[in-house]
Amino acid sequence: YLSFRDEATFSFLATDDRSFGEDQVVTIGNTRLLRFAILYGANASGKSNLLQALEFLRKFWLDDLITPNRATGATPFLLDQETMNEPSRFELTFFVGEVCYRYTLSLDNKRVYEETLHYYPGEEDNEVMLLHRIFQDNRSVITFGDMVQVSPAALEELTIKCLPSLSFFTARSMVNMSLPLIDDVYNWIQDQVGLTIPPEVDQVYFNANLIAAKDPEVRDFLSAFMRRADFNITGIHVETETMEMTDEIRNYVRQSANFPDRAKRAVMRQQTLDRHNVYFEHTVKNKYGTEIYELPHELQSNGTNRLYGVEAAIYDTEKRNGFLAIDEIESSLHPELVRLILDQ
């Protein structure tokens, strides 16, 4: 996949090294997991592509664009005559609550060849199959493990919805049914796997506005954090403006990099759109005494907007006990500000 020709593993399993303190580790049963990890490496060494692989999985699981000939979006390793024609393969082991799962996916740009989901009932138990989906006779063939009871009618409907280029989870979202354990994973994907934060400031700022607009607690936290960062910012407030959806707005949304594809399609179906404008409060002392001014984000530095966006995403992720990937966390930020983020 992308620049990865051979298997590469990125693990959050903690070693026995206790020199950094147990506050950086969370324990589930007998498994010790790191709360966060930092990738170092030379330019063009694949750091961003690793994060892009995680973002690809998130989008693939949640994509709701249902067309017969849609592409999966997978790009193989193209610097080898063999691998450019081979499927890309992903494997993800993760916890949802106290339950450990293992998910695998094999696909190229046209179709999914195999998709599986297993879980471990206990730490000493062997893994148990929940789902096995393969491409056979030009269609998806889905098999469930003994733990999952599905009626023949529901299985047939699910099979029809599960087009060759779609994730099983996309098809599952279109069928009214209950899938114990599998639905726990689906809900985890929706609620706790966050959008990867890119280096570009505009998209980070846009995502932060969505978070700050709906949660006063986030705004209070960000105000306090920006004061600690010594930006001469003493407060943050959000004004929400409801606008009618015009062709001009739809064209802007369609072309904007700030909207994920799934969000774009949801917005296109709406008759109105909420626009969140953030204002930063600056308190200054001059010959007139103490005065307060409010400035929009356009008049803030890239570093201010980047710090605001990154910290909003981290705070929201911690509240949801979720997963968040940040590409080039240091982009537009002084090293001391990066330290401030990591020290929280």
Provide a role label for each language-model segment:
Residues 102-254:
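Electropositive, glycine-dotted interaction segments
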Residues 6, 97-101, 111, 125-127, ...:
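Short acidic/polar mixed-charge low-complexity motifs
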Residues 185-201, 272-290:
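A short mid-domain helix/strand-loop element embedded in enzyme catalytic domains
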Residues 221-226, 265-268, 312-314:
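Generic recognition of flexible, low-complexity loop/linker segments
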Residues 90-95, 117, 280-282:
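Short beta-strand segments that buttress and anchor functional surface loops
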